[in-house]
Amino acid sequence: MRQILLFAALAAVLALLLVSCGGTKDKPVPTEEDAPDKAAYQKISAEEAYEMMASQEVVVVDVRTREEYDGGHIENAVLVPNESIGSEMPKALPDKEATLLIYCRSGRRSKDAAQKLLALGYQNVYDFGGVIDWPYELVKEG
């Protein structure tokens, strides 16, 4: 009698498992086309950023402080300190369709700035990290 009860309990548990793991006939599996459009910045290397600067129209955005910028920055970079990026579009970046190449000193602020710029509606945001990893020439003001 005990074996029959144990067998019945095991069969009931197995039946519950099979029912709870039912197929997805009623629900189609989501695909990339079904996913909502989520804007995301792209992380690229300094070398990739350099190639983009040489081959297409881009806006290079330095998100460090004025003092850091004056100490040496990438040629033609626009200064938009990370701390100044808030709920309004930065005046130095009027075109939300422009390709933006973002950098800071080490990569932390550029990541933060890239996320904030996406939230403001910028479409083509690339983060290439910090100027400490920039193997090319920097220019100084003055």
Regions found by a protein language model. Give the residues of each.
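Rhodanese-like catalytic fold shared by cysteine-dependent sulfurtransferases
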Residues: 2-10, 16-47, 52, 70-99, ...
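Short, glycine/acidic-enriched loop or turn micro-motifs at the edges of active sites
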Residues: 65
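Structural scaffold elements adjacent to functional motifs in cytosolic proteins
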Residues: 60-62
